[in-house]
Amino acid sequence: MSPLANRRFLKMHGAGNAIVVLDLRGTSIRVAPAEARAIAADAHSRFDQLMVVHDPVTPGTDAFMRIYNTDGSESGACGNGTRCVGYALLDDPAMARPAENGCLTLETKAGLVAVKRVTDRSFTVDMGQPRLRWDEIPLAEPFPDTRRIELQVGPIDDPILHSPAAVSMGNPHAIFFVERDPDTFDLGRIGPLLEAHPIFPERANISIAQVTSRDTIKLRVWERGAGLTLACGTAACATVVAAARLRMIGRAARVALPGGELSIEWRADDHVLMTGPVFLEGEGSLSPDLFAGLDG
């Protein structure tokens, strides 16, 4: 039997991004890709991202998080999921631990993130510094200026999308800025093709963004390893950074996604702050039947 059988989980969402939080502190259990896929496939535990909480690795941190996409792949960052973990570690009776001033320091394979409560159901995450060099994102070939890279969809003389910005927020993003409503583009068809484009050796999150004012952006996201999503916090952060670099906006904006709105600020110290809501939908336990026949 899988050691995950009968483990308790929280079902949450952040601005529409479906999140499952699984607490594995005090154990040596690691989630295998096949187990993550099985959890995602079940109607009771379906997720866009699975946030697995482990004991801290680095002194002074509160927990280590592993982040899984629906296809079982791991990600280095998930802003909406991090807010949900912040809620769980501060408010859930079975998970909460004492924290100073409602603040937590969490670690992922991409680095440290700080979470702070704003209101009962709103949290701010310090997502750290964006990575802007081509080899940090990473891209498969050198681009001296990642504000625009050479990539397009459609005919050479009349492309549907072209010249995206490239940014990493602990995971790679390509952002296409457009003048018309992002909903008018078939991102469900375009997204998977671009996600796996050879220019992105680690694949990429694909966003279509419309700047509607100096401090508002409308955004649609195809999420690497998950597909079309109602919200993606790291994509919102990457989009604000990219738009600011192109002087389309200042250094702060409200980003409207199908699942809700996020407030993003790229501070003068180069850190990106994301503020948004969390919602607890319920809890459950992982059925042993989910893992029957899995070999990991």
Curated annotation (Swiss-Prot):
Provide the GO MF annotations for this entry.
Answer: diaminopimelate epimerase activity
The answer on whether this UniProt entry bears the keyword S-adenosyl-L-methionine reads no
Catalytic residues as annotated in Swiss-Prot or TrEMBL? C78, C232
Q: Which GO terms describe its biological process?
A: lysine biosynthetic process via diaminopimelate
Where in the cell does this protein reside? Answer: Cytoplasm
Which residues hold substrate? N17, Q49, N69, G79, N80, N171, N205, E223, R224, G233, T234
Q: Where is this site: Could be important to modulate the pK values of the two catalytic cysteine residues?
A: H173, E223
The EC number on file is 5.1.1.7
User: Highest taxon of the source?
Assistant: Bacteria
| GO CC annotation | cytosol
- Pathway listed for it? Amino-acid biosynthesis; L-lysine biosynthesis via DAP pathway; DL-2,6-diaminopimelate from LL-2,6-diaminopimelate: step 1/1
Keywords of this entry? Amino-acid biosynthesis, Cytoplasm, Isomerase, Lysine biosynthesis
Query: Which reaction is recorded as catalysed by this protein?
Result: (2S,6S)-2,6-diaminopimelate = meso-2,6-diaminopimelate
The family annotation for this protein states: Belongs to the diaminopimelate epimerase family.
- Chain's role: Catalyzes the stereoinversion of LL-2,6-diaminopimelate (L,L-DAP) to meso-diaminopimelate (meso-DAP), a precursor of L-lysine and an essential component of the bacterial peptidoglycan.
- Oligomer status and interactors: Homodimer.
Q: What is this protein called?
A: Diaminopimelate epimerase
